[in-house]
Design a protein with these regions (language model features):
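N-terminal pre-ligand scaffold of iron-sulfur
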Residues: 1-56, 84-111
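Short cysteine clusters
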Residues: 42, 61-64
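Iron-sulfur (Fe-S) cluster-binding segments and ferredoxin-like electron-carrier domains
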Residues: 48-54, 67-77
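Short cysteine/histidine-rich metal-coordination sites, predominantly Zn2+-binding motifs
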Residues: 56-62, 75-84
């Protein structure tokens, strides 16, 4: 299973952060209470979510403004859509991201 390790301090607070590793683009987000990661692609028009912005626990896609709950990945505008999460492990200093190895990551974006 592919993974990548980061220092927690590498991930900015309340700002989407892009990680590219082993052919996968991921968006990592850290709030005061948690750190989450998803595939870096909006399920609506496949814009990179790492180029979006976070306000009040919501990530806004830079393409067409779709909004996603940072904690759950669920789309606020169209609840049938959600982001594809990757596993995040943290010891308070370091972060490890795990994901399934897929041929076409964007193919499974829709829930």
């Amino acid at each position: 299973m592919p993974h990548v390790d980061l220092a927690l301090t590498d991930v900015p607070l309340n700002s989407p952060f892009r990680v590219t590793h082993a052919g996968m683009n991921l968006v990592v987000m850290r709030t005061e209470s948690q750190i989450v990661a998803y595939e870096d692609s909006c399920p609506h028009a496949f814009w990179p979510l790492s180029e979006g912005s976070i306000a009040n626990g919501v990530l806004e896609c830079p393409g067409h403004g779709w909004e996603f709950d940072v904690a759950t990945g669920r789309c606020v505008n169209a609840p049938a859509y959600c982001l594809t999460a990757v596993t995040v492990l943290s010891d308070g200093h370091n972060v490890r991201l795990h994901w399934e190895n897929k041929q076409t990551p964007a193919a499974s974006q829709r829930a």
